């Protein structure tokens, strides 16, 4: 198991602020998985890839779905869109799993898909292709520019809420009316 070097930010959500200029990230809901002096990595859990499901992905990889239910695959972000990642509860892990915050793990190896197909995988999980990545200081700068709102997340929002509802639900859970957010943080 690998631990995250900056656990105080990993395991949180980045919610795109309503004034997000980057079209790729408008209404994005990023599960922040790693954050350190070299940069940050997260998965966009607010968007699915049309016509791609877990079963179709597993068949492409030569893995029989077995006992795992079929679910949509998330568009995790623009970096390495062919790379699969599974964000999941900590009740299952492999030696290659990275612990994310206090409650999740991120596994990027096929062993998690094999475990899911046998009914031996994590209880809660979601699959994504690609990820959102930031270089050193880049996410810090975007947060200063009021592109992102940082929030806590619960398992229901992460694993049960439909992807298309997560942005609005994330703000509601934080007690924030996103329509009233100021577009310039710290300015009167």
UniProtKB/Swiss-Prot annotation:
Listed InterPro entries:
AlgH-like
Q: Name one GO cellular component term.
A: cytosol
- Species per Swiss-Prot/TrEMBL record: Zymomonas mobilis subsp. mobilis (strain ATCC 31821 / ZM4 / CP4)
Cross-referenced PANTHER family: UNCHARACTERIZED PROTEIN YQGE, UPF0301 PROTEIN YQGE
Protein name per UniProt: UPF0301 protein ZMO0349
Q: Which family does it belong to?
A: Belongs to the UPF0301 (AlgH) family.
Q: Which Pfam families match?
A: DUF179
